[in-house]
Amino acid sequence: MNITKAYVIFFLVVILTNSLSNSDVLASSDIYICVTVIETTKNDVCSTPCTIRYGTFECFHDCILEHYRDGNCINGRCCCK
């Protein structure tokens, strides 16, 4: 009986912890929200946030694919020009 009670309590704690945790934070390393912002300075468009996995090389590559001549991470965002 004590083992069953312990399993039920453990199960409820896991469910409660899972429901209270912020699932967006856990999945944020694989999900990128692309918001295009028109810049009025030297760069034409700044969009995807730069992270450890999405750095200068990836930014440059994506900008070239979108027919810009250059791209770099500036202030934490991928900026194409």
Curated annotation (Swiss-Prot):
Disulfide bonds: 46-80, 50-73, 59-78, 63-79
Extent of the signal sequence: 1-23
Keywords recorded for this protein, A-Z: Antimicrobial, Disulfide bond, Fungicide, Plant defense, Secreted, Signal
Pfam families, per the entry: Defensin
Localization, UniProt: Secreted
Listed GO biological process terms: defense response to fungus; killing of cells of another organism
Protein name: Putative defensin-like protein 56
Organism: Arabidopsis thaliana (Mouse-ear cress)
